[in-house]
Amino acid sequence: MGRELQKKKNRSGNNKIKHKPKSKRINPLGNAIIAANWRQDETLTQNYRRLGLTSRLNTVTGGIEKKTAGSESKTSTANKLAISNAIPKNFAPTEARVERDPETGKIIRVIHDEKKSNPLNDPLNSDDEDGEGFEGFGDEEGSASKNEIVKMLEEQASRAGEKRERQQSEREKEWIEKLVKRWGENYGAMVRDRRLNPMQQTESDIRRRVQKWKDAGGVVTAEA
């Protein structure tokens, strides 16, 4: 039965949607700072991790590269922020006070230290880390260079791009010249002129364009 359905799909006139692979590719070397510190013998994820960056913003769902022993960083929060639902195999010893009956010596009750309930071992609810400050992401290996690269990228992003003023095209200059030649300074008439103002530009827009045209040295030329 399944084979017959497969044959029917193969005979279907609907073409299968095929995505071009190049449409999904990204250029990791688009930035000069990243390109200068890129290592060709490492993968994209390895390079980004070393530079203190991330290749994806979504949560990791699996298939990540396992780190070698000793490469775990104390400053890394990747494992600290993970919530494990599994029951721990080894329980850490804790201290508690015991109240006994003075006559029989039997234990009446056990008094534990006041501590918030944390059955899922959520580090965000842990009292042990309340006094610790955030120490940043990433590995200790190459942390100095990573911080320098991140600082350079942040400085580059903070610099405002050079703003270039829009230049009027030749056709726009000719259009403004026709308006000024016919109506002079009467901007209201320019707005109502359906022949010279078919796009229904507003009075303030035409006034701004005319002023910019005059500042650039625009003058009405006499017809030959």
From Swiss-Prot:
GO terms for cellular component: nucleolus; preribosome, large subunit precursor. Residues 125-142 have a biased composition (Acidic residues). It comes from the Eukaryota. The keyword rRNA processing applies. GO terms for biological process: ribosomal large subunit biogenesis; rRNA processing. Pfam families: Nop16 (PF09420). Keywords: Nucleus, Ribonucleoprotein, Ribosome biogenesis, rRNA processing. Residues 148-173 have a biased composition (Basic and acidic residues). The keyword Cell inner membrane does not apply. Residues 8-25 have a biased composition (Basic residues). It is found in: Nucleus, Nucleolus. Residues 1-27, 110-173 are annotated as: Disordered. Involved in the biogenesis of the 60S ribosomal subunit. Belongs to the NOP16 family. Component of the pre-66S ribosomal particle. This is Nucleolar protein 16. The lineage of its organism: Eukaryota, Fungi, Dikarya, Ascomycota, Pezizomycotina.
